[in-house]
Curated annotation (Swiss-Prot):
Disulfide pattern: none
Protein source organism: Rattus norvegicus
GO molecular function, one term: glutathione peroxidase activity
Protein name per Swiss-Prot or TrEMBL: Glutathione S-transferase Mu 7
Family: Belongs to the GST superfamily. Mu family.
GO CC terms, sorted: cytosol; sarcoplasmic reticulum
Taxonomic lineage from the root: Eukaryota, Metazoa, Chordata, Craniata, Vertebrata
GO annotation, biological process: cellular detoxification of nitrogen compound; cellular response to caffeine; glutathione metabolic process; hepoxilin biosynthetic process; linoleic acid metabolic process; nitrobenzene metabolic process; regulation of cardiac muscle contraction by regulation of the release of sequestered calcium ion; regulation of skeletal muscle contraction by regulation of release of sequestered calcium ion
Described purpose of this protein according to its UniProt entry: Conjugation of reduced glutathione to a wide number of exogenous and endogenous hydrophobic electrophiles.
EC number(s) recorded for this UniProt protein: 2.5.1.18
Quaternary structure and partners: Homodimer.
Sites where the protein binds substrate: 116
Main location: cytoplasm
Places the protein is found: Cytoplasm
Pfam families reported in the protein's UniProt record: GST_C, GST_N
């Protein structure tokens, strides 16, 4: 029986999950919910089902795999990572995965808060000012490794790809000074399963955010 991934019909927090499901050749189907237009941004498609799915903490995204019902995007990614041995093999690798997972989510939320803020245009220069320093830390952490934990890909590389590429969409030149990060993105997109997925009708790179966002809602 295929897994079910539920989320809005946007990229959002599901991008890394979709990529990981495709990479692991998982059998899954998507339940994509549509939000209404301004000014109401009607969410009834989701709210009508929210408390009927047996989720402990009802939210989007969710993954249902048989008796396992999981919310929180990183919990879903970790679950899939454990299923496919993509959580790091040594203690050092697992530490790197844990650190980066949380660091990436911090940075993801900073960008999301900016893009939903009514003062977006006023606050954008401040974000762009600190962006090179953020990218430099990722570049130094990756070093000469092919993947962020080491020689083998882990689930955190899927989050890293999403966050780095999302920032590249926001500011096209943000990785120009960091060739190892650009190489990482090319390496990730060059993976056969990922490349095939990106050419398919299932691939959903945009919109980045919901219709409520000031930037990234198209």
């Amino acid at each position: 029986m295929p897994m079910t991934l539920g989320y809005w019909d946007i990229r959002g927090l599901a991008h890394a999950i979709r990529l990981l499901l495709e990479y692991t050749d998982s059998s899954y189907e998507e339940k994509r919910y549509t939000m209404g237009d301004a000014p109401d941004f009607d969410r009834s498609q989701w709210l009508n089902e929210k408390f009927k799915l047996g989720l402990d903490f009802p939210n989007l995204p969710y993954l249902i795999d048989g008796s396992h019902k999981i919310t929180q995007s990183n919990a879903i990614l970790r679950y899939l990572g454990r299923k496919h041995n993509l959580c790091g093999e040594t203690e050092e690798e697992r530490i790197r995965v844990d650190i980066l997972e949380n660091q990436l989510m911090d940075n993801r939320m900073v960008l999301a808060r900016l893009c939903y803020n009514p003062d977006f245009e006023k606050l954008k220069p401040g974000y762009l000012e600190q962006l090179p320093g953020m990218m430099r830390l990722y570049s130094e952490f990756l070093g000469k490794r092919p993947w962020f934990a080491g020689d083998k890909i882990t689930f955190v590389d899927f989050i890293a790809y999403d966050v780095l590429e999302r920032n590249q969409v926001f500011e096209a030149t943000c990785l120009d000074a960091f060739p190892n990060l650009k190489d990482f993105i090319a390496r990730f997109e060059g993976l056969k399963k990922i490349s095939d997925y990106m050419k398919s009708s299932r691939f959903l790179p945009r919109p980045l955010f919901t219709k409520m966002a000031i930037w990234g809602s198209k």
